[in-house]
From Swiss-Prot:
It comes from Homo sapiens (Human). Residues 16-92 form a coiled coil. This is Protein ZNF767. Residues 98-132 are annotated as: Disordered. Signal peptide: none annotated.
Length: 155
């Protein structure tokens, strides 16, 4: 049998095939450009996320430092509270209800009675007049040793 001879391709068919291939190539090129744009946007978003992560890390380090300081201060305040509780428990303190001096110094005056001699101190009232104390008056706790230092010497 004779092999079938290849049919000649008409120039019109060839031109149509080339045009179809050009359209397909143009479509693929447009899709490739779209993918390149999406890749660029994704890379930009990734860089922004990395920058934000670094900023959050720096802020977190600062917050950890502040938290550490707060925990140290809390420990100090806890010890001071325990000391005051011990003083109250042992009734080994004097209470003064005096405002601080104009320059922040402790006022020089005679101390209020101790809780041993006057167990019913009128809290929030002036010992002299009985009037309510204003918020600028503060409670100061003094041990008897500290009170001795406040008293003028009798030399």
């Amino acid at each position: 049998m004779e092999e079938a001879a290849a049919a000649p391709i008409s120039p019109w068919t060839m031109a149509a095939t080339i045009q179809a291939m050009e359209r397909k190539i143009e479509s693929q090129a447009a899709h490739l450009l779209s993918l390149e744009g999406q890749t660029g946007m994704a890379e930009k978003k990734l860089a922004d996320c990395e920058k934000t992560a670094v900023e959050f890390g720096n802020q977190l380090e600062g917050k950890w430092a502040v938290l550490g300081t707060l925990l140290q201060e809390y420990g100090l305040l806890q010890r001071r509270l325990e000391n005051v509780e011990n003083l109250l428990h042992n009734r080994n303190f004097w209470i003064l209800r005096l405002p601080p001096g104009s320059k922040g110094e402790s006022p020089k005056t005679t101390p209020s009675p101790s809780p041993r001699s006057s167990p019913r101190l009128n809290k929030g009232r002036s010992p002299a007049t009985g009037a309510a104390l204003t918020p600028r008056f503060q409670m100061f706790l003094w041990t008897p040793v500290q009170m001795q230092k406040l008293r003028p010497s009798r030399d």
